[in-house]
Amino acid sequence: MARLGLNHGSTGNLSYRHDDSMLITPSGIESHKLSSELIASMNVNDSNGEFDGPLPPSSEWRFHQEILRKREDVTCVVHMHSTYATTLATLHRDIPAVHYMIAAFGGPII
């Protein structure tokens, strides 16, 4: 995400469902310092906050877990703070659905 200019610093995080586990990026790590050894693993069905890994999971782990728990069709959750989306949100402006697939599933604005 950072390489594409979609995210900066340590903001944003990613989770991935693997069987009954959720693999999730740790809190406070800049993306260029992230490696597979630092990824936290949690049971997608337990809300106790227990994890395996050297670093604690993202502070937004509950947000990721709840989406993965309620939506079995979802495999990955990406949470980021895109410069352009953040700017438009701050200005209270809509993001137009410029691709027909977005309009087909969500309407004319995001």
Predicted ranges, named:
Residues 1-110:
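Glycine-rich flexible loops
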